[in-house]
């Protein structure tokens, strides 16, 4: 795959929103997939397909039902309007009083048979965590999610994700993704100096330097 093309395929927006729990940060990803909306919807919502490109998921798959992804977030299905809109709460671990975190996926079919995919994550964030990492804290992970979905829709896959995560290709992807979220943060009104620190911290987290080899 061409890592630069994969990064550039995503449009990123960083903003703010009012929620019942107070002011939240928002990250929005937009990408066009060369697949009909019905196929994209099925890939995103079918528990048999999700493990092929994302994570195994269990739960009660109806509005008001609860779900859990393996080793990751869980929550409640808030809205489901096939094949256009899915909104869920997105909680890591136990819910925090006064917390707020929702993910909304929106699909728009195009006349040429492609589908515009939008994912918006709205969350009341810990101010210290935002200051340290900025939008890349969740944005890099969502970029990887959209990469996996694109490969799946194209009939491709990363055979051994754990090995790939340690590869130079994965480090390049995470580094470029972190920089792209930094640019989106500046466009969203963050200070360039603050963003430089956020990007450096996010890059170190997602793409740490490989351990040095034995001394000669």
Regions found by a protein language model. Give the residues of each.
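Ligand-binding pocket scaffold of soluble enzyme catalytic domains
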Residues: 88, 99, 103-106, 110, ...
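Hydrophobic alpha-helical segments that drive targeting, anchoring, or assembly
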Residues: 31-33, 68, 73-76, 90-92, ...
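Terminal "cap-and-tail" regions of soluble proteins that handle hydrophobic small molecules
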Residues: 1-21, 122-216
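Short, surface-exposed beta-strand-loop junctions and turns on beta-sheet-rich folds
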Residues: 48, 85, 94-95, 123-125
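Short strand-connecting beta-turns/loops that link adjacent beta-strands
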Residues: 82-83, 110-113
């Amino acid at each position: 795959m061409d890592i630069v093309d994969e990064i550039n395929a995503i449009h990123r927006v960083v903003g703010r929103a009012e929620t019942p729990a107070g002011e939240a940060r928002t990250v929005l990803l937009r990408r066009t997939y060369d697949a009909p909306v019905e196929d994209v919807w099925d890939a995103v919502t079918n528990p048999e397909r999700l493990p092929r490109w994302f994570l195994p998921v269990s739960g009660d798959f109806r509005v008001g039902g609860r779900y859990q992804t393996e080793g990751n977030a869980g929550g409640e299905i808030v809205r489901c309007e096939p094949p256009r809109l899915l909104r869920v709460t997105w909680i890591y671990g136990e819910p925090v009083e006064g917390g707020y975190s929702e993910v909304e996926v929106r699909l728009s079919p195009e006349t040429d048979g492609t589908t515009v995919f939008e994912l918006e994550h709205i969350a009341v964030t810990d101010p210290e965590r935002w200051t340290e990492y900025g939008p890349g804290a969740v944005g890099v992970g969502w970029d990887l999610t959209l990469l996996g979905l694109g490969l799946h829709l194209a009939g491709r896959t990363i055979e051994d994700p754990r090995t790939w995560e340690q590869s130079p290709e994965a480090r390049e992807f995470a580094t470029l993704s972190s920089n792209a979220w930094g640019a989106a943060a500046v466009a969203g009104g963050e200070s360039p100096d603050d963003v430089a620190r956020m990007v450096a911290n996010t890059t170190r987290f997602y793409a740490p330097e490989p351990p040095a080899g034995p001394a000669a």
